[in-house]
Amino acid sequence: MNFYLKTTLFAALALLLTSHAGCKPHAAANRTEAAVSLDTFHLYDQARHRDVPVAVYQTNGKRNRHQKMVLVSHGYGENSGDAYLYYTFLTEFLARQGYFVVSIQHELPTDSLIPMTGIPQVVRRPFWERGADNILFVIKQIKQKYPDRGFEEITLIGHSNGGDMSALFPQKYPGIVDKIITFDNRRMALPRSSRPRVYSLRSSDQTADAGVLPTAEEQALYGMKIVALADMPHNSMCDQATAAQRQEINRHVLAFLQEKKH
């Protein structure tokens, strides 16, 4: 095998291995803690003729009439159909803190797979656009289904490809969400804005494309927070995380959510 072919194959393999979150169902993915209720159901968007499965996590304790909504978008799951259940360590934790948590299944088995070649910002843009449309649809449907909750604040959380679509959302649909928190999105540029507030947790083994992350000057100007985690592989930012990694992610996310508006 010549050098050029070896190099090409290596590059292709590297892209394949780092192109999606790589999360798998965890043993606890189908079990919710006693303090948290889980309700899974399908929403159907008639305008787009699309099924959107969701999982709603709520505390079983006293619920605030003015709950804050958190929408979680999973990393690329190769159309497995259950990737929205790969983040129970986070969704259950936030539900216990009183948040109304909705995890969205963005990929369906009948969807096309995300392209592994080409310029990501071009070939993957339609997938992010669809994800942003899913998020908007779910927000509207949840508000109708739970009219007594108020939902005074809405936050988007997204891992990897889900972070890319979460970063796109406020740029496509401004004025709807209050905060976005991404877990190591690497392709879609984070919005440079003070509303929504922008936060991002960065892995210890992957880098973002040029222009995705704000400069130090932009962070200071807009109040954006980019946190580099020392021992946090990209593929561990889900239920595959160790107990220590889960605790670290939850700690940062809760701090971001509790940060007051300026």
Set out the residue ranges of the language-model regions.
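N-terminal Sec signal peptide cleavage junction
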Residues: 20-23
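Conserved alpha/beta-hydrolase "acid-adjacent" motif
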Residues: 207-214
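Bacterial N-terminal signal peptides
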Residues: 8-18
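Short beta-strand/loop motif that positions the catalytic acidic residue
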Residues: 199-202
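Primarily recognizes the serine-hydrolase "nucleophile elbow" in alpha/beta-hydrolase
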Residues: 140-194
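N-terminal cap/lid segment of alpha/beta-hydrolase-fold proteins
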Residues: 25-65
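C-terminal catalytic histidine-bearing segment of alpha/beta-hydrolase fold enzymes
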Residues: 223-262
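Serine-hydrolase catalytic machinery in alpha/beta-hydrolase-like enzymes
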Residues: 50-149
